Swiss-Prot record:
This is Antirestriction protein KlcA. Keywords: Plasmid. Belongs to the antirestriction protein family. Coiled coil: none annotated. Could be involved in overcoming restriction barriers during establishment after conjugative transfer. InterPro entries: Antirestrict, Antirestriction_sf.
Length: 142
C-alpha cells in the first residue's frame, strides 16, 4: 500500500481557546516562562520590534508556534550565526518560537517536560520546511 505523508498544517487558535493554549503546549508550570521567552527572543532578534498582539497556532502534527500580528516584514539579525534578513511576521514568529523552545528545553534538561519541548521543537522545525520562507527560517536558526 502506497501512503503519502500529509503536509503539516497550521491552524489559528480561536479566541475562545487561547486560555488553554499556553498550558497545553508549554505545560502549566512553564507557560509564563515559555511565552515570555518567545517575546524576548523576537525583541533580541529584531531591533525595531516594539510589541504586538500575538497569534497562536497549532500544528497538525502536535506542534505549535506564536507569531506577532504585524503587516510589515521584520529585519532579523542573529548574532550567533551571522544571519541577517527580512522575514514576514509569521516566519519571525516561527524563528522566535524555535529559539524559545530550545532555550527552555536546555533550562530544564533531563526532565519529561524538556523531552516534550524538544519534540515540539522538532515538530515546528519540520513544519518550517514547508513554509514559503523555509530557506530564511533555516538560515536564521542554523
Amino acid at each position: 500500500m502506497n501512503t503519502q505523508d500529509q503536509p503539516v498544517t497550521a491552524s489559528l487558535v480561536a479566541e475562545a481557546q487561547r486560555l488553554d493554549f499556553l498550558p497545553t503546549y508549554f505545560g502549566p508550570r512553564l507557560m509564563m516562562r515559555g511565552e515570555a521567552l518567545v517575546y524576548a527572543w523576537l525583541r533580541r532578534l529584531c531591533e525595531r520590534y516594539n510589541g504586538a498582539y500575538w497569534h497562536y497556532y497549532t500544528l497538525s502534527d502536535g506542534g505549535f508556534y506564536l507569531a506577532p500580528d504585524l503587516a510589515e516584514r521584520l529585519e532579523i539579525e542573529v548574532d550567533g550565526n551571522g544571519f541577517r534578513g527580512e522575514l514576514s511576521a509569521d516566519a519571525a514568529g516561527i524563528v522566535a518560537t524555535l529559539f524559545a523552545l530550545g532555550q527552555l528545553a536546555a533550562e530544564i534538561a533531563g526532565t519529561d517536560a524538556a523531552d516534550a519541548l524538544i519534540d515540539r521543537y522538532h515538530f515546528l522545525r519540520g513544519f518550517a520546511a514547508g513554509h514559503p520562507e523555509a530557506a530564511a527560517i533555516y538560515r536564521a536558526i542554523d
